[in-house]
Amino acid sequence: MLKQYLKEHYLANHKALYVTLDDFWFTNHHLIDVAEYHYLHGGTVLFVDEVHHYPFVTWSMELKNIYDRYPEMQVVFTGSSMLQIDNTLADLSRRCVFYDMYGMSFREYLEFYDIMNVPKISLEDLLQNHVKIGLDITSEVKILPKFQDYLHYGYYPFYKEVTDSYEKILQQIAANIIEVDIPAVEKIEYSTVVKLKRFFALISQMVPFSVNATELSKNIEVPRQSINKMLALLKKSALVNLLYNGKNTMGQLAKPEKVYLENPNLMYALTPRADIGNIRETFFANQLMRNHEVTFSGKGDFLVDSLYTFEVGGKNKKFDQIKDVSKSFLAVDDIDTGFGDKISLWMFGLLE
């Protein structure tokens, strides 16, 4: 992504420099020396990729020093989702703005592939006006085939470049996150990495599922108390989403009620016979968890912002399970537009 931006905006001059810190060259060279050389030779922009692979423990301090020494230089850096803004990054966080980079929402997918530009909508607007919004969109685009394409290959923007090997690449990315990214950030032993990989392979065939720590610990031969910690690592690395019963105030100690893979594309790549009902729930959780609190609901599938209850299903889904629940809605697949409190599932991919 950084290289693409550089090509589009800085190809004609030498004021911008791109480096990736997983390059072998950085095993005995420091980033701050590169920044100094670039600045002294007229550089004004420095793109730094993969900071979590920097072989020295000083990457955040070096970025801070670059900012302080060369205030005219703009620095853009990327790192694994494993990098949390904690006390070790406090000095750096006061000097820069951090962004979480998610995969594409369905709305972003429609725009990326030049299918249709749809404005962002709020959840409240969707709940109140979904019929009109849906009719406006479906009058211009046959939306259901596009939605099915999105569920299979629309989450990551590189599908166009790797069409025939997309699912294989997703498998490789998942393995690389566990084998390389997590150990680069977390202090874990190789034996733990092996068990974490086994754990992820196991749960990818089970999702979504309710957590039975005793059974899982037997299958991968780890202490029972390690299961929640392993799930938390997979969550931080954007491989799974965890659904808790109410607000999680216990961090890694809390037991999630349900585990999902992070997005439907991963499900199709890792679970060839993925159940469509599970795909639907995975999509809903993925799209809503970006900007909303999504927790386990005892009556429906999801409780959003401690206010709205949602049941997810196919076009024949009924209100039976949530008929007595206030502010409850059906998120239904295989319909262009909904009616009343029955909302087309694809529309939850339009949220801001």
Question: Residue spans of the language-model regions?
Answer:
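A cross-kingdom feature that marks ATP-driven nucleic-acid transaction machinery
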Residues: 1-11, 232, 237-352
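Short glycine-rich substrate-engagement loop in P-loop NTPases that contacts/grips substrate
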Residues: 13-45
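Catalytic P-loop NTPase motifs of RecA-like helicase/translocase cores
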Residues: 25-27, 53-55, 84-85
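Conserved P-loop NTPase "ATPase switch" module shared by AAA+ and STAND
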Residues: 39-59
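Conserved Walker B catalytic segment
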Residues: 52-76
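Short regulatory helix/loop adjacent to the ATP-binding pocket of P-loop NTPases
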Residues: 83-98, 112-114
